[in-house]
């Protein structure tokens, strides 16, 4: 059964919030915090809670580290380059710390949940005052207070799985789109993946808590809700309340909004889930289903618990049930022991599925995973060649993928000004497709209808038909 933090512990942290607030109130100017979340949407969501706690402690926010009184990096551990970026950023803060001895530097998240990384940071980066893992984020007020009042340096990396803290304050990045975590952790232990080690075992939030949060966001005017979890398809096993049932209940909430979710695992994706999406009023017609590889031999080595036949059957059912379903995926190139024949299996699967887009990565060795100990005879040069070959295949598919929408009138959530220089507005359709269209700034946050006229490799463009709210 999932454990939740008891109210007494949260009240203790609230007392620390008030203590830090009192200290900050004595300053001549409001202290500023710089918070940077690296990596996935779950980290971004955690960063919003961190900002919520900091705001209650009396901090304002700045995008510039040079102006900050507190700098906090919320880190990612999925790939080595993400860790290298963090170390580079922390190293660059050394001069700031020398100029301002009162500057507080904190590093949290998945990267420092790894013991060897946490110890390296403690020994090699003395400018870092607070190091905290993924399971103790709610105790940040206490760690900051102890630094301010006692100049205490903190390393808090508990090995036990975290518990769920309900009711933490949130400062959301958007007034239109909101993320709602529905579960934490992962039980799959794919051999290449560090997530179960840094996020712990699967823990689902109670259905009534999720439903209440989503209702509140819709009532507050949010137009898109993104449901988050390392494996949302395995939600609710503790409560006999599966993910398809949760989606069905959320879809009943009155209002004009869109529901989307990530990330899914093919072994837990079911016809029931696909049917729920197809029959819904609000759920996105976009299915992100990471395949990782098109070789059954390598899928077994990855401990993925499905084969390509099962995966293709799910895709074909989704195409049958969900109108013009948008399909995206994740693919790893160069897994230890992968041969060129294995790689060609991935190429053929990509051609058969015809993804709208694919997030493709060269294998990144993660210390502590089973794959890290596997022989890896593939040269970096070959991995690079395979990677580029796969990108070429996907790009050729993606160039024409969105042509199926030409002539359709689609509803789009207007999110802002487009990236091009032609003054178009932009947003996403129910399929998760980027849609650029002629419009005005006052449409931001509203649903509009657009007639699609042109398909591009990564977006579509069209003509505004109507503003719907």
Regions found by a protein language model. Name each.
Residues 1-234, 272, 309-320, 344, ...:
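Proteins enriched for Cys/Gly/acidic motifs involved in redox and nucleic-acid/cofactor modification
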Residues 40, 236-255, 302-305, 365-396:
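Radical SAM enzyme [4Fe-4S]-AdoMet core and its adjacent flexible, acidic
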Residues 82-84, 201-206, 236-241, 301-304, ...:
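Short, solvent-exposed loop/turn segments at secondary-structure boundaries
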Residues 104-107, 114-116, 218-340, 351:
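Conserved SAM/AdoMet-binding glycine-rich loop
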Residues 173-176, 186-188, 283, 293, ...:
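Short flexible coil/turn linkers enriched for glycine and charged/polar residues
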Residues 190, 227, 261, 289, ...:
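Conserved, mostly hydrophobic/aromatic
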Residues 373-469:
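Terminal RNA-binding accessory module
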């Amino acid at each position: 059964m999932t454990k939740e933090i008891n109210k007494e512990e949260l009240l203790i942290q609230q007392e620390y919030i008030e203590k830090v607030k009192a200290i900050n109130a004595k300053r001549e100017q409001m202290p500023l915090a710089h918070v940077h979340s690296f990596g996935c949407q779950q980290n971004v969501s955690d960063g919003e809670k961190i900002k919520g706690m900091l705001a209650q402690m009396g901090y304002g926010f700045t995008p510039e580290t040079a102006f900050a009184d507190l700098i906090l990096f919320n880190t990612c551990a999925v790939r080595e380059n993400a860790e290298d970026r963090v170390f580079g950023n922390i190293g660059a803060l050394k001069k700031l710390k020398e100029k301002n001895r009162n500057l507080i530097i904190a590093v949290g998240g998945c990267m420092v949940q790894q013991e060897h990384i946490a110890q390296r940071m403690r020994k090699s980066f003395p400018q870092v005052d607070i190091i905290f893992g993924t399971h103790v984020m709610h105790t940040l007020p206490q760690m900051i207070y102890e630094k301010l009042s006692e100049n205490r340096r903190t390393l808090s990396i508990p090995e036990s799985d975290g518990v769920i803290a309900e009711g933490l304050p949130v400062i959301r990045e958007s007034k239109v789109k909101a993320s709602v975590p529905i579960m934490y952790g992962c039980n799959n232990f794919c051999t290449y993946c560090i997530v179960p080690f840094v996020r712990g075992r699967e823990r689902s939030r109670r259905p009534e808590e999720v439903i209440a949060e989503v209702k509140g966001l819709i009532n507050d005017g949010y137009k898109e809700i993104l449901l988050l979890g390392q494996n949302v398809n395995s939600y609710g096993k503790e409560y006999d309340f599966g993910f398809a049932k949760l989606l069905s209940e959320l879809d009943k909430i009155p209002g004009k909004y869109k529901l989307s979710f990530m990330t899914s695992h093919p072994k837990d994706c079911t016809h029931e889930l696909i049917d729920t999406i197809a029959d819904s009023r609000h759920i996105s017609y976009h299915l992100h289903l990471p395949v990782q590889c098109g070789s059954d031999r390598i899928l077994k080595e990855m401990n993925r618990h499905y084969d390509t036949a099962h995966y293709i059957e799910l895709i074909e059912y989704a195409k049958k049930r969900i109108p013009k379903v948008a399909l995206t995926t994740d693919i790893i190139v160069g897994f230890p022991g992968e041969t060129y024949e294995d790689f060609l299996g991935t190429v053929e699967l990509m051609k058969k599925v015809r993804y709208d887009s694919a997030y493709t990565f060269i294998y990144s060795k993660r210390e502590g995973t089973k794959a890290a100990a596997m022989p890896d005879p593939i040269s970096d040069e070959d991995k690079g060649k395979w990677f580029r070959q796969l990108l070429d295949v996907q790009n050729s598919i993606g160039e024409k993928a969105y042509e199926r929408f030409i002539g359709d009138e689609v509803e789009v959530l207007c999110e802002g000004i487009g990236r091009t220089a032609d003054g178009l507005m932009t947003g996403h359709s129910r399929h998760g497709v980027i849609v650029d269209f002629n419009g005005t700034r006052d449409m931001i946050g509203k649903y509009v209808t657009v007639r699609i006229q042109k398909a591009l490799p990564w977006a579509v463009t069209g003509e505004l038909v109507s503003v719907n709210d």
